[in-house]
Regions:
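Solvent-exposed loop/turn segments connecting transmembrane beta-strands
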Residues: 1-8
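Gly/Pro-enriched, hydrophobic low-complexity segments
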Residues: 10, 14-16
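Transmembrane beta-strand segments of outer-membrane beta-barrel domains in Gram-negative
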Residues: 16, 21-171
């Protein structure tokens, strides 16, 4: 594989705010893809960029469990060209809030559960409903999505463990 096929860079910085446990973070991502193989003659080129600001606050902190309230805003951009013709051009700004519960020790395992709500906005140059080249026809940039996640890592006998994960989402 060539290093030209995919390149990804991410940065994240977190800083505690006061003594309450509040943590602020900023993150960024940039990725380029130029697939080879049998689609190389199509000259597919994709570019993805994202920047996010987040806050995380501990509602409950105990030795064996924690409950966090987290929220943030992310501005995302995706562009894909084929044969020098724009196929996809998405720009989204998403505000989100979630509750995250983490527990360890019960039956010698760890459990994580989260509930999140995400809402698309028109901020920071987000595309409109009439934008050309969206990745999904009729895409509404002011969408709402609710997601659920449950994970369990269970220690078994000796060096063995089992992992299970369940996720679901509803979009409107």
């Amino acid at each position: 594989r060539s290093l030209r096929e995919i390149r990804i860079g991410t940065l994240r910085y977190s800083e505690p705010i006061a003594s309450s446990g509040l943590i602020a973070s900023i993150g960024g991502l940039y990725a380029e893809a130029r697939p080879g193989g049998i689609i190389r003659p199509l000259d597919v080129r994709s570019h993805v960029a994202s920047i996010s600001l987040r806050l995380r606050y501990p509602l409950l902190r105990q030795r064996n469990q924690s409950l966090f309230l987290e929220g943030g805003i992310a501005a995302n951009s995706t562009q894909t060209d084929i044969l020098n013709t724009r196929l996809i051009s998405d720009r989204q700004t998403v505000i989100d809030a979630s509750l995250l519960w983490q527990q360890s020790g019960w039956l010698d395992g760890t459990t994580t559960a989260s509930l999140g709500i995400y809402h698309g906005t028109g901020l920071f140059g987000a595309m409109s409903r009439s934008a050309s080249h969206p990745s999904v026809a009729g895409f509404d940039p002011r969408f709402t999505r609710v997601s659920l996640l449950g994970q369990r890592l269970q220690r078994l006998i000796g060096p063995f463990s089992a992992y299970a994960s369940v996720q679901g989402q509803y979009s409107k």
